[in-house]
Curated annotation (Swiss-Prot):
Gene: fhs
Positions with a binding annotation for ATP: 44-51
Name this polypeptide is given: Formate--tetrahydrofolate ligase
Similarity annotation: Belongs to the formate--tetrahydrofolate ligase family.
One Pfam family this sequence matches: FTHFS
Organism: Desulfotalea psychrophila (strain LSv54 / DSM 12343)
Length: 557
């Protein structure tokens, strides 16, 4: 890699952070490399190997003697210790070392937890002091009364695990010196607005300014109260100042991988950081990043949020598909994590695959609406049948998309050469990148565009609460500066995870609209989504342990 010693900040023997400012200052006059996003069709609950495909593509491009870097999200401890496991890839296409990658890395998520929870500490402490002191006593401490409404608190506590018992809690049940007695909650750390800010900030100054705008509550006159009002924004930034530098790891074949930020895509922005992409585009000829879940969720946010915030324009988008997922969308039984795969998936069924390709075609068309060249990667499994693969290739090519079969899980970079060649060719073609909406488009119209053009809905409905917030936001002069970050299930194009393929004749229900002014977007919430996932009955932590002779962790996957 083209890095100087001063730009590398070692963390042990296998991981480092990169001083993004020194790199970007030194490389300011260089042209950017090719920018590639890896997305997917609507996944099964098992996932379709998108992270594995990112690693495989990076390795394949390396085998073609291309200067390449990967840029992926840091995994949350919640899924790692739950059913899903880590997100390092698999087989011969992984980000290594796995244990460091999966168990905290350099502490970025911990820094975000401390910063976020410090905001809650400041809020609840202020509420206690305002309850116990007169205005004159507050003034003696250089404080003014914020008059926080106890039922209009926007912030929660966060923890990096899936802990359903913490979704609804009561705090402050002691005496008057034990804080206010209020209903509160915990969310998973990667859903924090601070994680979104880390993902989209262009530099430290941008991150500092965004943290100051985070709304933590409203007062009794319904005016927003920010971290700056609590005078905690500087300290929150201090907790995150090291986290702003991307983490450097590698594939199994030695290509560099930048790991930075980790917001989920169904409940947050679902992207690795803008800063990691800026660094990758300057130090390599190809920067391969990943957006969470399917193109309806992760790619849509990459397209209309991340690229808008960063100013970067992609050259190509990869859509990862598996025969397994196509069969699921075509009528096969839905696989359940932790249970044996239904036997139907091991048998040839071209009809199911062809029917499932309707979902794939929908995502191809979504990528085309962004003006980007699509490449379909068939992430090959040993149960795939030649006739099933032929059907997918025929349908994709007829739709005008490049398609490549990749066996990177089994063969590493050597199995991804066809995949890499397709991406190289796509990057050489001109594209006409354009956003789905401009920021001066009214929020209601934006939601309608996303629902109809990306999800395939007939229209949008609103609960009375959501309609009230929509009306209020229409009058907010800052609305024109905010993007739109939709929240919905990742298991269907619709809001209903049971509806597979390309659902028809449905309306997208918006039950609430949240505002994240620090991150710079509003969040329309479709369907029932929790910011705190639950831990299942057979979690991964049951199989994680430590070798007492070597001290090495075992059982992480």
């Amino acid at each position: 890699m083209d890095l100087t010693k001063e730009e590398i900040l070692p963390y042990g023997h296998h991981v480092a952070k990169l001083d993004y400012r020194k790199i970007l200052d030194r490389c300011a006059d260089r042209p950017d490399g090719k920018y590639i996003d890896v997305t997917a069709i609507t996944p099964t609950p098992l996932g379709e190997g998108k992270s594995t495909s990112v690693m495989g593509l990076v390795q394949g491009l390396g085998k073609r003697d291309k200067s390449v870097v990967g840029a992926i999200r840091q995994p949350s401890g919640g899924p790692t210790m739950n059913i899903k496991g880590s997100a390092a890839g698999g087989g011969r296409s992984q980000c290594i070392p796995l244990n460091e990658f999966s168990l905290g890395l350099t502490g970025d998520i911990n820094s975000i937890m401390n910063a976020h929870n410090l905001g809650m500490v400041a809020l609840t402490a202020r509420m206690q002091h305002e309850a116990n002191y007169t205005d004159a006593q507050l003034a003696q401490r250089n404080l003014k009364r914020l008059d926080i409404h106890p039922k209009k608190i926007q912030f929660s506590w966060i923890i990096d695990f899936c802990a359903q018992a913490l979704r609804n809690i009561t705090i402050g049940i002691g005496g008057k010196m034990d804080g206010p007695t209020i209903q509160s909650s915990f969310a998973i750390a990667v859903s924090s607005e601070l994680m979104a800010i880390l993902a989209i900030a262009n530099d430290l100054a941008d991150m500092r300014a965004r943290i100051a705008k985070v709304v933590v509550a409203y007062d009794k006159q319904d005016r927003p109260i920010t971290t700056a009002d609590l005078e905690v924004d500087g300290a929150m930034t201090a907790w995150m100042v090291q986290a702003i530098n991307p983490n450097l790891m590698q594939t199994l074949e030695g290509q560099p991988v930048l790991v930075h930020a980790g917001p989920f895509a169904n409940i947050a922005i679902g992207q690795s950081s803008v800063i990691a992409d800026r660094v990758g585009l300057k130090i390599a000829g190809y920067n391969v990043t990943e957006s969470g879940f399917g193109a309806d969720i992760g790619f849509e946010k990459f397209w209309n949020l991340k690229c808008r915030f960063s100013g970067n324009k992609p050259n190509c988008a990869v859509i990862v598909a598996t025969i397994r997922a196509l069969k699921c969308h075509g009528g096969a039984p839905i696989p359940v994590p932790g249970k044996p795969m239904p036997e139907e998936y091991a048998k040839e069924n071209v009809g199911w695959v062809e029917e499932g390709c309707k979902n794939l075609l929908h995502h191809i068309n979504t990528v085309k609406k962004a003006g980007i060249n699509p490449v379909v990667c068939i992430n090959a499994f040993y149960t795939d049948r030649p006739n099933e693969i032929k059907a997918v290739k025929r349908i994709c090519e007829h739709a005008g998309a490049r398609v490549a079969v990749s066996t990177h899980w089994e063969h590493g970079g050597d199995g991804a050469l066809e995949f890499a060649d397709a991406v190289i060719d796509a990057c050489e073609e001109k594209n006409d990148f354009k956003f789905l909406y401009e920021l001066d488009t009214p929020l209601e119209k934006r939601i309608e565009l996303i629902a109809k053009e990306v999800y395939g809905a007939d229209g949008v409905s609103y609960t009375p609460e959501a309609r009230t917030k929509l009306t209020q936001l229409a009058k907010d002069p800052e609305m024109a500066e905010l993007g739109t970050c939709m929240v919905k299930t990742h298991l269907s194009l619709s809001h209903d995870p049971k509806l597979k393929g390309v659902p028809k004749g449905w309306t997208l229900p918006i039950r609430d609209i949240l505002t994240y002014k620090g991150a710079g977007f509003v969040v329309p919430v479709a369907g029932a989504i929790s910011l705190m996932p639950g831990t299942g009955s057979d979690p991964a932590y049951r199989r994680v342990d430590v070798d007492l002779q070597t001290g090495r962790v075992k059982g992480v996957f």
